[in-house]
Regions:
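Short hydrophobic beta-strand that contains or immediately precedes a catalytic carboxylate
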Residues: 1-3
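Long, charged alpha-helical interface segments
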Residues: 55-92, 106, 111-112, 128-214
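Phosphate/ribose-phosphate-bearing ligand recognition and processing surfaces
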Residues: 120-130
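Short, structured patches in soluble enzyme cores that scaffold and shape functional sites
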Residues: 77-78, 97, 117-121
Length: 214
């Protein structure tokens, strides 16, 4: 499964919560722009900023029911959709965020398969928020029978989560992407992005399309 907490997987969950029909992730801005010319709704950003020709940026608050309900949305972001491209050989890729943490864990347990958590990071670099989510999800899965891990990165992410979860929003003041969004005036989505279990959707990428399987 994939985590891009700020902001792609959180925003994808919000889109399905508000009634989007399906999401078509694309890896390049050129492909996204071509889809726009074909009449699709397009959400696209670069380095956090909405592109002028796109209908939406990458904020969960963009995706209201009025804007996307019942529609197909093309999606291209700096980190999230590129991570999907990296992982697309997997049979299924679930989209994980704090907003669907429990629903996602339950879905993964029902799937009864090995779980790999891919943190999208920032331009192929480590980021705090995705690793915090990985720790939260790992800790939750380990409460279910049959789940174990001897992965150092999983253990480290759980340790990070244990420290940060005492006061998550305060801890996130350290996060580099938190400051990037603040400089762009886009940090209004921070509290929402770290709210736990506000939706039961489980967006899953399969055969080139993301649909809600929750």
């Amino acid at each position: 499964m994939l985590a891009d907490i700020l902001r792609a997987t959180t925003s994808i969950c919000a889109a399905f919560q508000n009634g989007v029909k399906e999401i078509l992730p694309v890896a390049s801005l050129e492909e996204a722009r071509e889809m726009k010319l074909k009449g699709f709704l397009v959400a696209s950003e670069q380095d956090g900023k909405k592109l002028d020709w796109a209908d939406f940026g990458n904020s969960a608050f963009n995706f209201t029911t009025e804007a996307i309900g019942g529609r197909t949305l093309v999606y291209c972001t700096t980190n999230g959709t590129r991570a999907i491209e990296i992982a697309k050989s997997a049979e299924k890729i679930a989209m994980g965020a704090f907003v669907n943490l429990s629903a996602l864990a339950e879905w993964l347990v029902k799937e009864n398969k090995n779980v790999v958590i891919l943190c999208s990071g920032w331009k192929n670099k480590f980021c705090i928020e995705d690793s915090l989510f990985a720790g939260a999800l790992t800790a939750k899965l380990l409460n279910y029978p049959g789940y174990t891990t001897c992965c150092d990165s999983a253990q480290a992410s759980m340790d990070l989560w244990k420290v940060a979860s005492v006061d998550l929003l305060s801890y996130l003041e350290k996060a580099a992407h938190r400051h990037r969004l603040k400089k762009l005036g886009l940090d209004d989505v921070i509290p929402y992005s770290f709210s736990t279990d506000t939706t039961r959707v489980v967006p899953v990428y399969e055969n080139g399309v993301i649909r809600d399987l929750g």
